[in-house]
């Protein structure tokens, strides 16, 4: 993607949409959304442009099979139902992510290599975990990881009535999509409630709180990035008496608090859909395509763009940017190929 982004970057996309009348805003985590917070504004804008350019849009035409006659170079598209088939000199496949491998069967006559699609953007279920009572609580800077792996993510973490969500969880689900699928969404996750800070740093912070609040109970004085309810929960999880005064806290109790704050192990058992799981990893393998033009290596005039390819990213416009960049790449390649 880095090479392709040089041809049509996030800046280009930003300017393009604003020139078409869509006002955008960039959040602190660099995610871009319409100021209206209405995704349909993007859809409506694209639809208006299609109509303005006189592009024919066939709805209700589900493609069942794509075949290629290499002798005359023509492609044949077979539609579902009683609809007649269509022929084309060039085909661009931009069907988005597919939650089921069977939806990639349209490529079967072409011997296209595909990777099994699996969800890659979802929140996590923590059945039986008492933290769910704190639903609605947000920790702005948290780090999540899966013990024994290199999968790691950071960002805001949201406690929900089913478990956990927010960027720190959604990013982790994206990075570890195949791992989680293979383990049937049952795994331990490790949470650092202090934004990735090391145990030594958190020990210093709690020691400073202790020194300034010797007569206060543990539940009454706590790190400023946590709220009182979550702090109470974490104290109890550390098996430390919340009514203990800071001046009475021994080293052993301090270490327990630090360990919970920096390495809180929770059990995940299941996933919850995030906006109907509109992101998947898997799809058409990148081994099939020329990485500069996104044209098939084996079928002249066949292109792929967007999430139908085995690419995915986190929420906030990154998947859309990848799709628009690839769309631009394919358009330029087709113009160059067929301009004569």
Place the predicted regions along the sequence by residue.
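Glycine-rich loop(s) and the adjacent beta-strand/alpha-helix scaffold that form part
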Residues: 90-132
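Short loop/edge segments at beta-strand edges and connector loops
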Residues: 57-61, 116-118, 306
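Residue-level recognition of phosphate/Mg2+-coordinating polar/acidic sites
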Residues: 6, 12-30, 78, 94, ...
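Short hydrophobic core segments
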Residues: 63, 86-98, 106-108, 157-162, ...
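A conserved FAD-binding loop/helix module that cradles the flavin
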Residues: 90, 94-108, 310-339
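Conserved N-terminal/central alpha/beta ligand/cofactor-binding core
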Residues: 1-56
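Core beta-strand elements of the Rossmann-like FAD/NAD(P) dinucleotide-binding domain
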Residues: 58, 80-90, 152-155
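A conserved short coil-to-beta-strand element within the FAD-binding core of flavoproteins
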Residues: 59-75
